[in-house]
Amino acid sequence: QSPKDYLKQIEEKKKDYNGFNLLVAEKEELLVFSNYGGGVQQVPPGIHGLSNAFLNTPWPKVEAAKADLKKLLEHKSPKLDDLLTLLQSKEKAPIELLPDTGIPMDLEQTISSQFIRVEDYYGTVNTTALCWGHDGTVSIKEVRTIPEKEVNESTFVSW
């Protein structure tokens, strides 16, 4: 089954789920689907960012992560841990750069960092880095943050 066919099946059931973004890839094809709208879209080669909106929504944290990744790629071939470090930033965006998403601006600023922790009720749970080599090898590392246990668990997969 092709990625596009798979996502078309998911699209038919999109109302069964809370909001989500899903990336699906095979060989040199990467597709994204969001049940927020927009349908199945092909992702062109390049640097992209994804948060709790559509792919490449120009939120400060998305733009900052894309810029940081571009800098990292200019200087070396990043390792998974380098990529995960980019996503652990707790730096908050200035209020004047924040989008108006309908929540209070103080909360908007609190959640404007790459890594979010708002007391015990909201925040980053999983951070995932993926490297897809020119030779076709794929490596994925995901870190799960469990604040109540004050621990991080990580999973690594490669093929």
Feature map (PLM): residue ranges:
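N-terminal nucleophile
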Residues: 1-159
